[in-house]
Each structure stands twice: as C-alpha cells, then as structure tokens.
Amino acid sequence: KVDAERARKEIAKAQEKQQEVQKFSSVDRMMNNGFEANRGRLPMPITGSYKIVSHFGQYNVAGLRGVTLDNKGINIMGGPGCQARAIYDGEVSAVLSYAGSVVVMLRHGAYISVYANLSSASVSRGQHVSARQILGTVGSEHILQFQLRKERAKLNPEAWLGR
C-alpha cells in the first residue's frame, strides 16, 4: 500500500514536470526555429567596421612549437568606441564581471550568445533585447570575444554570422 501511494505521487510529480517542460518548450521551440532559420544571416555582434583576428577552435601559437590553444569563439576587432550588439532577439541571462571586464550572455531559446571583453554593459539580467540592440561598449584593444552555444555545445560563430 505504501509503495502504491509513493508510485502515485511520483507519477503525479512527473506529469506536473512534463507539463512545465511542454509550456517552456513551445516558447523555446519558436525561438529555436527562428534562430536556426537565420543560420549564416545573423548580424555581426559589433558595430562599425571590423576584422576577425582569431578564429574558432584549436590553433597553434605563433613562435611556440607544439603549443596549441582552443578559442571557444571568435575575436573581432572593431574601431575606437565600437559596441557589442545582440545578434538575435533574446533575454539577458547574465551580466558578469570577469578579470576586469564585463561579460553579457543572451539566451535565444536553446541557443546562448556570449559577448566578452566589454568595458561596460547597457543591459541587465532578465531584460528582453532585440536583434542589433546595443549591449555594451567593447573594452581593451577594441576586441570583442564572441561565443555561440547550443546549450553546452560550443558552435563556430562564423557559420552563423552573415558578412
């Protein structure tokens, strides 16, 4: 009798969780479908003229034989006063201070865009942003470190951005 009661409670709890997931998923699915449909056409995450100075993935360090590093995103150099901007509609999931700079993270359904090496942020956690909305000012050497993920999986941002 105790086992049957426990099983009933577990089933009720599982059904409740499933309903929550379905509610959340429909919004997520809409966001994902729109985001995925724009692969290769998303705007550059930096204002003004730019140059990609470091690409995604592993690379050999110049002058150091046998030393490789892994870039989790791309590094984009802009001009003086350049700003980071949202690549797609989303919600600010975090604004963090890290190693003397600011990092902004946006959630677009299951996708997350990360804007690092900012000197300041003009958005706050929980805020909804639109595509091309300014997120903050790019910091030292005018280099934005931009990352893109689908949940925890790192993606090559260059495959998603238009030129």
Identify the meaning behind each predicted range.
Residues 110-122:
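Active-site region of chymotrypsin-like
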Residues 138-146:
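Active-site loop architecture of trypsin-fold serine endopeptidases
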Residues 1-101, 105-107, 114, 130, ...:
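Extracytoplasmic/periplasmic cell wall- or extracellular glycan-interacting regions that localize
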Residues 95, 134-137:
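Short basic/hydrophobic patches in alpha-helices and adjacent helix-turn junctions
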